């Protein structure tokens, strides 16, 4: 029987999730994968709120190493030792769950955003950018569909509410609630990664698009590397406890697993304002199953739990690579 409830500790890594509720003023057509639309609106509003030079190209800006927009949205421009080879943005979108793709006036819908490390200190700026983006209007097949951000919550903490506007976005960042950790699960025999959004796994320079190109072991290696990279880049003063002191120790655990996958090809179409065209993002979706003895699976559980929030693969800022754990 699937375990729907796990024992959760109060201790957490420096990662926080925010749930945003929107009330539409104009009809809005949500594309099947709305991450590109949401990310574009967010980036435009964040730049408007942050930029003081109004230069068209951030790479030429003398302040780009201090700019909050650059740190949040154009992280690859920040010159640090951790960015010498690769970089990741300190946020991931959590896409709307609505089955209907047309949101009518006065209807509400919701989505989320996860912030990592130092970006949590900028939560008020980030939520203000979302407020401005939604009020300005999301791209609706060439038109603007305006709305109102009526509520933002961080777990059980309400940060913004139209019912209490004077108290909105004034919570100190240290009071923002971080994600919980997870305790070991007794008699655990199987873990399933159920993907809520497509994932794009790059291996040997190519994106796996067909099931026969996919290796579940490489997915776990990718997740391990992503967690290490996010920890070092965005939260370097903390040690995210994932039960592994080094990569060799992690690989040794993988050899004890029985790995199965039930995945299929999928294509996500995104808009590129810079290139002024549609771009196809090929990837996979489905389930990945891990079976082993309880001790082995519990060694992996903290890492897999953390991956639910960080996502996996490429284009995580668009909300891709999000999965949900199913424990048995």
Predicted regions located by residue number:
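RNA-interacting cores
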Residues: 1-328
């Amino acid at each position: 029987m699937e375990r729907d409830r796990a024992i959760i500790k109060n201790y957490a890594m420096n990662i926080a999730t925010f749930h945003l509720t929107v009330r539409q003023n104009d009809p809005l057509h949500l594309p099947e994968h709305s991450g590109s639309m949401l990310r574009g609106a967010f980036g435009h509003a964040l730049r408007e709120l942050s930029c003081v030079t109004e230069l068209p190209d951030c790479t030429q800006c003398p302040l780009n190493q201090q700019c909050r927009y650059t740190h949040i949205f154009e992280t690859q421009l920040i010159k640090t030792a951790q960015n010498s080879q690769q970089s990741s943005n300190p946020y991931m979108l959590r896409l709307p769950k609505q089955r209907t793709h047309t949101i009518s006036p006065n209807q509400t819908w919701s989505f989320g955003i996860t912030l990592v490390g130092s970006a949590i200190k900028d939560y008020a700026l980030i939520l203000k950018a979302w407020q401005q983006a939604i009020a300005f209007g999301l791209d609706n097949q060439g038109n603007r569909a305006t709305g109102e951000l009526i509520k933002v919550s961080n777990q059980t903490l309400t940060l913004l509410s139209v019912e209490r506007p004077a108290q909105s976005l004034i919570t100190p960042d240290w009071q923002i609630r971080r994600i919980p950790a997870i305790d070991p699960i007794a008699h655990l025999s199987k873990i399933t990664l159920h993907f809520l959004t497509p994932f794009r796994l790059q291996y040997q320079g190519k994106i796996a698009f067909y099931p026969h190109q996919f290796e579940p072991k490489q997915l776990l290696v990718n997740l391990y590397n992503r967690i290490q990279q996010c920890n070092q880049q965005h939260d370097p003063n903390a040690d995210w406890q994932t039960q592994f002191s080094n990569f060799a120790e992690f690989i040794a655990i993988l050899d004890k697993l029985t790995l199965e996958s039930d995945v299929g090809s999928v294509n996500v179409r995104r808009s590129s304002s810079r290139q002024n065209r549609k771009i196809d993002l090929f990837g996979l979706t489905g389930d990945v199953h891990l079976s082993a003895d309880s001790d082995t699976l519990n060694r992996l559980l903290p890492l897999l739990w953390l991956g639910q929030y960080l996502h996996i693969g490429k284009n995580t800022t668009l909300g891709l690579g999000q999965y949900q754990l199913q424990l048995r």
